[in-house]
Amino acid sequence: MLDCIKNRYSPRSYLNKEVEQAKIDEVISAGLRAPSGRDLQQGIVICITNKEVRNNLAKLNASIAGMPEGVDPFYGARVVLLVAHKVSPLSDLNGAAMIENMLLEAQNQGLHARWINRGKKELETSEGKNILKMVGLNPDEYVGVDHVILGYSNEEPSIKEVKPNRVFYIK
């Protein structure tokens, strides 16, 4: 497991290559198995592979971030996993655990993944609420967390060094 963690990186460019459904399913399964407060398991994953929906979400995300028109905040990845959670004081924490599990399982599956922010703000907009409605969820009951983008990297791996002096012991 530690090798998987050490070798994981977040590419900024993805190949225009389809991701196998079985691999997507395994990544999602890992997210759904993340720990959650009181084991309520209220986090959800919306898997977006529809090109039009994905591109509209990318435009919304870029707009929220103040990116110039035409910039793809999903870096060309064909799969966007939008993590949301039932409204709760633990939404961010539970959702973050789901995202971390999915990032690691993507690496395990030979995929590349990146955590993309602004999910909360997206689902506060009418466009974001429509995504929840598309899958039959009540937008008033869910808050956005963030995204995991999946695909195959178009870059050489760049493993970053761990910054020193970040662990302290009390014995």
Range-by-range predicted roles:
Residues 1-171:
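Acidic, surface-exposed loops and disordered segments
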